[in-house]
């Protein structure tokens, strides 16, 4: 089973389900983003969790395959996927990882990799109208985008993934992990993209989601206070500013396209196209 593993809450919980409940071989994938400040911590976290699993559950040594690491900068941009992402973002903004994750899968011929998308996740809300449940050969139920919606941008973007945590939220994961005795392992996970002195910042998107979805205890108290004011004063402005920026970019593109159709006066001769403005 292919699993996108980051060392985070959702993907680690899914790893534990696959290894300790379903007992199936797992190939974990990690896409390294050199611009992300948390990359080193994420890799160290996964290494610690894998070592703990091998020590505590001997059978996982054979089931958990070596992590496969690829670099985001090596992913070739795919025009169809980029167009689908632009279309989806007109309705709901989702992160840049959905530009390179599906492109990576397409580039490497991966047509079923599990993602830890869960209730309260933006992607869960996007996929829900197009979702279908299916029986996985490994003996569990999962969710993916129904091929009957192949004409939609949602299908083009998410067709490579399955979503086994589709019907559970972070608190549900917390309860299930405690019931299984996995609480200590889950506390080893990492989620912050921009750590401050090695601790969660409280301001990045994963920190905000962690707080708002019921796991505020995982963020240091001082950063929770800062996050409170950030979420009430600054965060509400991000979406309208993003929309304004996209609108201005679109208008500039249309003006640039119009100018490229005009004849150039002199220089290269009549009818030569203008260079696009910088």
Predicted region positions:
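Nucleotide-activated chemistry modules centered on ATP-dependent adenylation/adenylyltransferase
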Residues: 1-4, 9-277
């Amino acid at each position: 089973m292919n699993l996108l593993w980051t060392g985070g809450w959702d993907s680690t919980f899914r790893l534990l389900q696959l290894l300790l409940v379903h007992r199936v071989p797992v190939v974990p994938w990690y896409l390294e983003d050199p611009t992300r400040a948390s990359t080193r911590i994420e890799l160290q976290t996964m290494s610690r969790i894998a070592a703990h699993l091998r020590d505590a559950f001997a059978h996982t040594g054979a089931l958990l395959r070596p992590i496969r690491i690829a670099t985001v900068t090596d992913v070739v941009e795919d025009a169809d996927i980029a167009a689908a992402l632009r279309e989806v973002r007109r309705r709901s903004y989702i992160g840049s990882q959905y530009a390179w994750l599906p492109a990576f899968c397409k580039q490497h011929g991966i047509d079923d990799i599990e993602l830890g998308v869960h209730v309260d996740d933006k992607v869960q809300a996007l996929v829900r109208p197009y979702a279908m449940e299916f029986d996985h050969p490994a003996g569990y139920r999962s969710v993916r985008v129904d091929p009957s919606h192949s004409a939609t941008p949602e299908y083009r973007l998410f067709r490579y993934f399955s979503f086994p945590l589709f019907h559970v939220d972070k608190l549900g994961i917390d309860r299930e992990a405690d019931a299984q005795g996995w609480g200590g392992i889950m506390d080893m996970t990492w989620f912050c993209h921009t750590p401050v002195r090695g601790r969660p910042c409280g301001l990045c998107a994963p920190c905000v989601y962690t707080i708002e979805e019921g796991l505020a205890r995982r963020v240091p108290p001082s950063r929770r206070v800062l996050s409170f004011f950030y979420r009430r004063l600054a965060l509400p402005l991000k979406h309208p500013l993003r929309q304004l920026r996209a609108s201005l970019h679109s208008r500039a593109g249309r003006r640039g396209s119009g100018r490229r159709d005009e004849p150039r006066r002199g220089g290269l001769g009549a009818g030569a196209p203008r260079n696009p403005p910088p």
